[in-house]
Amino acid sequence: DAVTSGRLLLHELGHGEVAEFHHGDLWEPVLGRRFDVIVANLPHFPMGSNHVPGRLPSWSAGGPDGRYLLDPFLEGLERHLTPRGRAIITHNAFVSVERSREMVARSGLAVRVALTTLVYIPGDKLACMTDHVLEVEDGRSIHRYGPYAFGEMHIVEIGAPGTVG
């Protein structure tokens, strides 16, 4: 599973003693705790609950607008960061970064897009994307090169104003 794989990887890299992994219902396993760094790669691909052979049902499934898990994560983030703490998350460009920025601003946090890259979107995954999102974002944050499709993926840093960047 992801927790075991993550622990093994960090031990191999020499960081196993300073990292914690938690498994559970979003913020529930860490209620009342604050962290200097939170790293998350949430499923937030805009799609319904489609079955894709060889993939778990939760594979990338972020609900019709991609925000099913992203929004509750962002809403609870401020309660789990130390005053100078920050979160580093992946954020698909076709799932409004501006909406995320507005959400965390209500909690007194700031967002900075630290890096943008293109990520290959396999055809079976693209076929699962919510039609409306695909119509709006095709040619904007989803780019096609011949038979291949790529989506803009941001690495986003979130923290108190003055601590990000």
Regions from the language model: what does each represent?
Residues 12, 38-40, 56, 106, ...:
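Short, hinge-like loop/turn segments at secondary-structure boundaries
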Residues 1:
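Conserved Rossmann-like nucleotide-cofactor binding loop
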Residues 4-32, 36-40:
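S-adenosyl-L-methionine
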Residues 116-165:
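Conserved Class I S-adenosyl-L-methionine
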Residues 40-72:
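Mobile active-site "lid"/loop adjacent to the S-adenosyl-L-methionine
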